[in-house]
Amino acid sequence: MAHKVILLGLDGASFKILQRFMDEGKLRNISKLASLGSMAEAIPSVPAFTPTNWATISTGANPGTHGVFTWGTHLEGEPLEENHFDEAMMPRICRAEYIWETVSRSGKKSALINYIGYPMDSNNVYHIDWLYQPDFNYFGVSPPKMYVINLKTNIKSVTRESEPGWGMDFLSTEGREKETFEEFLISDVKNSNTIATSFRIYLKHIKLQIEFNLQASVHEHFCSVKLSTSNASVELKSIGQWSEWMYIPTKAGTASTRWKLLSCNQNEVRLYRSSIFIDKLFSFPTELGSKLYKNVGPYISDEIGKLYLKGQIDRGTFLEEMKYKLDWIAKCINFLKTAEDVSLIMLHWHYIDSLQHSVPSVIY
């Protein structure tokens, strides 16, 4: 009987700290996995860069063989100034065979979750929210945000850095092809405003805008915040409450997001909005995304960690989003293993490393 393999890559995790927590009985599931499979401290490849190590893990080859030495590389015959920085984890740079290519040659399926190696040359390989596609562009159309609505002045702020932006707030994006911004449109209705989230979808040449109509009613012992689009609406009535998922049809697919009421008084309302993804734009093949939305649920990014480290979001909300993401990954793996008969699943879990990368920006 053929076995199925799941490789869990905990980016930024310390083996010594994991071992300590396992010994203290605080990581029962990790301990169980270690007892059923294998777990060992890895020796990093030289040079010890992110793309170098992920390529080594994925191929079993050393950097001298696979050719991925750092962020960017130089290919034979090209000018010295050619860097290929954005393509450091793409297969055209790697000269060794990936393990999923070997699996594909045997007629079996593989799935890569937030992993390197797209676009692949092999059949039978699924990609979900892949790392470092061309132009360094992630497939979420809008990162998570925290909003402060001043009910007295009708002024809204959108948190980004340690100081909130006012009016129109341009969101920082890594890609050169995706423009994302949010704008508050003042309504004639009392205590009603529209949050307009606009974005351009990478490689699709599609520019979209989602407008959330916001109505807030606050009294001494009662609070109601309604958010609606032309196709969906939610209402929040208690502090700490999460909304149901909002599913918003667009010409690129179905967008999804949810909201949480952080605080509410007669002066202001604070809201958190999860990241926005479109069902057909975070997986390959695209139809896999629709299946995952139906059987697993909407996908979210890891970027709330940046808001948490900057003090813009509370620890409880951060942990709730992290738990949702972990539950989603577990359900996704089970779905791929059973419904799609995937033999190899490779996961790159980035939450810990996302927090570590965010620390310098908080300090400086």
Can you name each region flagged by the protein language model?
Residues 2-19, 33, 57, 103, ...:
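Beta-strand elements within well-structured catalytic alpha/beta cores of enzymes
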Residues 6-7, 19-24, 35-36, 75-77, ...:
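Generic detector of short, locally flexible boundary/turn motifs and exposed helical patches
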Residues 12-15, 35-40, 50-53, 76-87, ...:
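Glycine-/proline-rich flexible loop or hinge segments
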Residues 9-15, 52-59, 284-292:
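Short, mixed-charge, low-aromatic patches
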